[in-house]
């Protein structure tokens, strides 16, 4: 695994009432209020009066994003970009609705994601397949298509200049085939989407983050996820911005935790991936594994509190592991 010197200290900014958390270098996390507070973030980047969003949350997040612009005394005309790290609808679902308010903004997306933003029908159906119709209706809002002429696709390694500095996009499969990360080499910050795990601030112990991999359906691939984690570490970032949730430091320790987590998930899937009642058994074992990690992390919360924080992720991770296990089994059967 790629290693770099780990001299970063945990640094955390305070959350303010509006759900905006300010970090260094004109970066703010905006709580999109998806599912529960501090669960799903959009990032607002501000450079010399110009603005960009990294991910948007769902369509229901749009009022929060517009309010954040207002709070920062920015106009809707000042937004140049919406960077979508990937097109899962808890991060890209609001882009079409937000774009209607932003006359000058364009959307940067992975080439595999672009067609599904122009016509989101399949994306909506797939998301309903994962979460169920009632949950989707209550938590995602109306997903609007994005006009093709406002989309730009990012090639692997694309560097581009915005306002006062260069940024780079790296294609990073593992969580999703349509995923890229955005790298700001001056701030030394990676916007990692879901590629550097999920880490909720309610599970911090003494300012130290707890992180677990996100193996959401349907593209989870463990070897690609290991590679992507290493690729992020190799950049030697001072901080990584996660969609779930906020900015984390101590990158090398978290990367090691993520590598171990991916291996643990795969072992659990291997034990239960083809058996009857596998969803329940994999879910139970994932919770036990996470609980043991939390104990070692110094967390003292009871099982009920841990279930409240982790159950949705466990459900998604199990579904993603099953997709992966079935894909591996099918490829063995067909000899590919
Ligand atoms: Zn995702």
Residue ranges and their predicted role:
Residues 112-116, 247:
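Short histidine/acidic/glycine/proline-rich micro-motifs that form metal-
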Residues 5, 10-15:
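Intrinsically disordered, low-complexity segments enriched in serine/proline and basic residues
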Residues 218-235, 240, 248-283:
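Internal alpha/beta domain cores that form substrate/cofactor-binding pockets in large enzymes
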Residues 17-72, 182-194, 198:
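Conserved beta-strand hairpin/beta-sheet module of binuclear metal-dependent hydrolase folds
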Residues 58-60, 117-171, 177-241, 245-249:
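Metallo-beta-lactamase
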Residues 63-109:
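Active-site metal-binding motif and surrounding structural segment of the metallo-beta-lactamase
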């Amino acid at each position: 695994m790629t290693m770099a010197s780990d001299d970063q200290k945990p640094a955390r900014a305070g959350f303010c009432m509006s759900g905006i958390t300010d970090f260094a270098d004109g970066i703010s996390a905006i709580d999109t209020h998806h599912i529960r507070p501090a669960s799903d973030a959009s990032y607002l980047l501000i450079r010399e009066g110009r603005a960009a969003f990294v991910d948007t949350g769902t369509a229901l997040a749009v009022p929060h994003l517009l309010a954040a612009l207002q709070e920062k005394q920015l106009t809707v005309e000042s937004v140049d970009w919406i960077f979508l790290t990937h097109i899962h609808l808890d991060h890209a679902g609001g882009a079409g609705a937000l774009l209607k308010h932003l006359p000058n903004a364009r959307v940067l997306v992975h080439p595999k994601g672009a067609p599904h933003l122009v016509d989101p029908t399949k994306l909506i159906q797939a998301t309903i397949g994962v979460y169920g119709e009632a949950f989707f209706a209550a938590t995602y809002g109306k997903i609007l298509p994005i006009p093709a002429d406002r989309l730009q696709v990012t090639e692997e390694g694309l560097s581009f200049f915005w306002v006062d500095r260069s940024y780079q996009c790296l294609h990073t499969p593992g969580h999703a085939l349509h995923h890229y990360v955005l790298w700001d080499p001056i701030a030394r910050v990676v916007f990692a989407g879901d590629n550097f795990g999920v880490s909720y601030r309610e599970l911090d112990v003494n300012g130290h983050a707890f992180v677990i991999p996100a193996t959401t359906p349907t593209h989870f691939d463990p070897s690609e996820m290991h590679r992507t984690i290493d690729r992020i570490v190799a950049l030697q970032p001072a901080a990584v911005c996660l969609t779930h949730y906020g900015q984390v430091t101590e990158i090398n320790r978290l990367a090691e935790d993520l590598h171990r987590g991916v291996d643990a998930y795969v072992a659990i899937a291997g034990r239960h991936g083809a058996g009857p009642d596998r969803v329940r058994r994999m879910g139970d074992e994932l919770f036990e594994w996470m609980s043991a990690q939390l104990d070692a992390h110094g967390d003292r919360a009871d099982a009920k509190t841990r279930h409240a924080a982790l159950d949705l992720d466990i459900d998604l991770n199990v579904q993603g592991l099953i997709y992966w296990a079935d894909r591996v089994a099918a490829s063995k059967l067909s000899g590919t």
